[in-house]
Amino acid sequence: MIHLTGENLKFKEIEKVINHGEQVELSTQAKENIIASRRLIDDLTEKESIVYGVTTGFGKFSDTFISSENLQQLQENLILSHSAGVGEPFSEQVVRGMMLFRANSLAKGHSGIRLETVQLLIDMLNKGVHPIIPSKGSLGASGDLAPLAHMVLVMIGKGEAYYHGDRMAGDKALSEAGLSPVKLGAKEGLALINGTQAIVSVGTLTWLRMKNLLKTADICAAMTIDSLEGILDAFQDKIFRLRPHPGHGKTAENIRRLLQDSEIIENREHKRVQDAYTLRCIPQIHGASKDAHEHIGGILNREINSTTDNPLIFPQENEVISGGNFHGQPLALPMDYMSMAIAELANVAERRIERLVNPNLNFGLPPFLIKDGGVSSGFMIAQYTAASLVSENKSLAHPASVDSIPSSANQEDHVSMGTIGARKALSILENTEKVLAIELLCASQALDYRQPRQSGSGTRKAYELVREQVPHLAEDRELASDIETVEQLIVEGRLVSELEKTIGELK
């Protein structure tokens, strides 16, 4: 059971909730905080005080006073009107992340929402009622309005949801889960949708998968170094003590461990003084992406445990203050940074693939890694596929955050586009997983030709894992299924987890 406080939700806990259905509950202190902030909202509505989003309209309508008899309708209309998203629905994991992160933010007690409303959101999460949320339509300020509105639709008995794998009307999903829709009170609709939880959810899921991707990239690179009889001098620890970026040293250590006891490298047949950059500079290239990953993780963790509402409720001071915590810019820039950091892993991997298949660069391996070249084309078109994915990544890596379009009659005249950036980062990651799968296939094929010399202790294990799934390519066959099989080995984390059982945890 994960206890939500709004202060210290951690990535390991997030993984358990999003991927494994771990149950969630509010801490005692969180409940007290929520009740205290709601008490102030109730006092203000009784006095008919003018407070943005409580007794006024929204956006450009903020100067329109709403009488007490219309406050409930105001909040329901907010959800209905803001449910304007389009496109394919977010995945179940993204939706669960949005629900979890919104509940955690509300747990801090600065949003003025009722305890029973937050509890319904948590009950939906725990029971597996997953609102259908279109993935497009957010500007990333004022928060992720459209995506979160679709989440709240189900809470009020509207919209659609998945329950036990079946798509159904929102009210039916609640009923089958033993839950009842809520009637939103003053400010509650605004409290539920004024946040950055779509950006955070997509970004966090991408970040979590990137951790596995970074280790996978090191494994693939080590296999390519092994199969190309690479020079290990460039990975000596003393080099990285002189330029101590953390990711550089971690990558170099991984490469050394993966290639330990490689007979191919110890008995090199093709002598040279130094390798090309795509081999020699792997610590600097991969390491920079690792440092980016570390930096972005800190930002995501801060945001997950923040209040991103407006206005903010300060019950101790008896204050309600309008601010800009909903603005997604603190996330939009890191999402673009993550896109570039992941794209670079694909860029360098594709160049390593080229070195493996190109007879002018691969030190005695068959052209396109096939013995009967000419009759068979081998991995020629697999490299094309990698090049296509890398080129697509370059387009996707163009920063979303440099764009802004004014909205709400120019009241909201700068927006972050952070949700677009997060979605692009996820697409780049998925493309990069495919590129690494192709490198893994090519490197395994290359290692076949280096036998009987044995590869390194780590690369040998990775090779064995691939060969358990995909046989040597002796003659042309459909490669799409091979790529997909190895991609799943990567995506499911089996490549990394099984290899770490052999050589210990990679950094």
Swiss-Prot record:
Gene3D superfamilies tied to this protein: Fumarase/aspartase (Central domain) (1.20.200.10), Fumarase/aspartase (N-terminal domain) (1.10.275.10)
Protein's UniProt keywords contain Lyase: yes
EC primary class: lyase
UniProt pathway annotation: Amino-acid degradation; L-histidine degradation into L-glutamate; N-formimidoyl-L-glutamate from L-histidine: step 1/3
Catalytic reaction list: L-histidine = trans-urocanate + NH4(+)
InterPro entries reported in the protein's UniProt record: Aromatic_Lyase (IPR001106), Fumarase/histidase_N (IPR024083), HutH (IPR005921), L-Aspartase-like (IPR008948), Phe/His_NH3-lyase_AS (IPR022313)
Record note on modification: Contains an active site 4-methylidene-imidazol-5-one (MIO), which is formed autocatalytically by cyclization and dehydration of residues Ala-Ser-Gly.
Modified residues (2,3-didehydroalanine (Ser)): S142
Protein name: Histidine ammonia-lyase
Gene: hutH
